[in-house]
Swiss-Prot record:
Official protein name in the record: Transcriptional repressor NrdR
Transmembrane segments: none
Entry function: Negatively regulates transcription of bacterial ribonucleotide reductase nrd genes and operons by binding to NrdR-boxes.
Coiled coil: none
Keywords annotated in UniProt: ATP-binding, DNA-binding, Metal-binding, Nucleotide-binding, Repressor, Transcription, Transcription regulation, Zinc, Zinc-finger
Pfam families, A to Z: ATP-cone, Zn_ribbon_NrdR
Signal peptide range: none
The ATP-cone domain, residue ranges: 49-139
PANTHER family noted in UniProt: TRANSCRIPTIONAL REPRESSOR NRDR
Protein origin, superkingdom: Bacteria
GO BP terms, alphabetized: negative regulation of DNA-templated transcription
Cofactor(s) the record lists: Zn(2+)
Family: Belongs to the NrdR family.
């Protein structure tokens, strides 16, 4: 690390401590050239991939847009804010775990549908009907029948 006082490249770490509930590392450093001491803070940079839309355009991941879409599907459904936030965290974790700098928006849509299906099937159908652009009652019926046939359903 460069010394902020003299610009030298050689510094040594004198002390390291976890701060901010373990989310940050505070390091006390000393410049080997001028002897000045200074403090640095390190945090992990967890960047979410950019989205590739169906038309080929690219845009940054927007957590608020994702939250709003899921909240719209969950409107007037018995799902707590905590469960919604856990689902959002799970989606973001899966996106980061891809290791990709860009992902297709279809991937995000499928992750959202998977999480909504676990949270509330009515919300899942609401979201799927818009996301998959259901055109008539038969498409609703087919999706509901598919849900009913899944293992673990009575």
């Amino acid at each position: 690390m460069h010394c902020p006082f003299c610009g030298a490249n050689d510094t040594k770490v004198i002390d390291s401590r976890l701060v901010a509930e373990g989310e940050q590392v505070r390091r006390r450093r000393e410049c080997l050239a001028c002897g000045e001491r200074f403090t640095t803070f390190e945090t992990a940079e967890l960047v979410l991939p950019r989205l590739i839309k169906q038309d080929g355009s690219r845009q940054p991941f927007d957590e608020e847009k994702l939250r709003a879409g899921m909240q719209r599907a969950l409107e007037k459904r018995p799902v707590s804010v905590e469960r919604l936030e856990a689902a959002l965290a799970h989606i973001k974790h899966k996106l980061r775990a891809t290791g990709e700098r860009e992902v297709k928006s279809l991937v995000v849509g499928e992750l959202v549908m998977g999480e909504l299906q676990k949270l509330d099937e009515v919300a899942y159908i609401r979201f799927a009907s818009v996301y998959r652009r259901f055109q008539d009652l038969n498409e609703f019926r087919e999706e509901i029948d598919r849900l009913a046939r899944e293992p673990g359903k009575e």
